[in-house]
Amino acid sequence: MSARTVVILAVLGIALPGPTPIQAQQTPATNPLDAVPDKMPFDIPYGTPISLERAEAAIAATVAEAKKHDWKLNVAVVDSGGNLVAFQRMDGAQLASIQISEHKARTAVTFRRETKVFENAIQQSNFHYVMTLDGVIASRGGIPLVQGGRLIGAIGCSGGTGSQDEVACKVGAATIK
């Protein structure tokens, strides 16, 4: 029986016994969430919380990068427990981005990964369940601060585009070694 005949019979409401050729050709898609990795992803141990001095140095580097491009950003640094250590609002930075910069930093430290990972999960992989996780902001610009293989805090930037926020924050994160 041809596929055209099956479609005509289906439109007329005539049921056929057993699977139709159209049904037989479809195979269920594999769920990428069913994959079991050998190692725990983003398994970065927490370290001693970042000091105020180092947080301010990371912010200074971030602000210097933003100024090169005339980007007006809010920059927040949190410690390994997600507590605010330092913050700077550049002149003219939008007010809504104050909380967003802190949220990006907290997400990066809490989940031990860049916030871009969540953005990619939603936009590129259709992992919409990410939006149900408490405390997640799925927008780039939150970068973990890792020293000696240990997570000591995170930096978050907001006020520009996601890519601008990310570029500036990575400059600040690079001050931590």
Spans of model-derived segments:
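N-terminal secretory signal peptides that target proteins for export/translocation
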Residues: 1-3
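Bacterial N-terminal signal peptides
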Residues: 6-18
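Sec/Tat signal peptide C-region and signal peptidase I cleavage site
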Residues: 19-24
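Flexible, solvent-exposed loop/hinge segments and secondary-structure transition points
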Residues: 25-177
